Amino acid sequence: MSSGGLLLLLGLLTLCAELTPVSSKDRH
C-alpha cells in the first residue's frame, strides 16, 4: 500500500472542494 495513491486521492478531493466552493455557498 503506497501512501502516494492516498496522497493523490486526498489532493484531488481537496482540489475539487477548493475549485467548487460556490456549490457549498449556493446552498446557503
Curated annotation (Swiss-Prot):
Could you tell me one molecular function GO term of this UniProt entry? potassium channel regulator activity
Say which domain of life the source belongs to.
Answer: Eukaryota
Q: Where in the cell is it found?
A: Secreted
- Signal peptide span per the entry? 1-24
Q: Does the keyword Signal feature in the UniProt annotation?
A: yes
Task: Give an example GO cellular component term for this record.
Answer: extracellular region
What's in the keyword line of the UniProt record? Disulfide bond, Ion channel impairing toxin, Neurotoxin, Potassium channel impairing toxin, Presynaptic neurotoxin, Secreted, Signal, Toxin
Tissue specificity as recorded in UniProt? Expressed by the venom gland.
- What do we know about how this protein assembles, alone or with others? Heterodimer; disulfide-linked. The A chains have phospholipase A2 activity and the B chains show homology with the basic protease inhibitors.
Q: What does this protein do?
A: Beta-1-bungarotoxin is a presynaptic neurotoxin of the venom. The B chain is homologous to venom basic protease inhibitors but has no protease inhibitor activity and blocks voltage-gated potassium channels (Kv).
Task: Output this protein's name.
Answer: Beta-bungarotoxin B chain-like
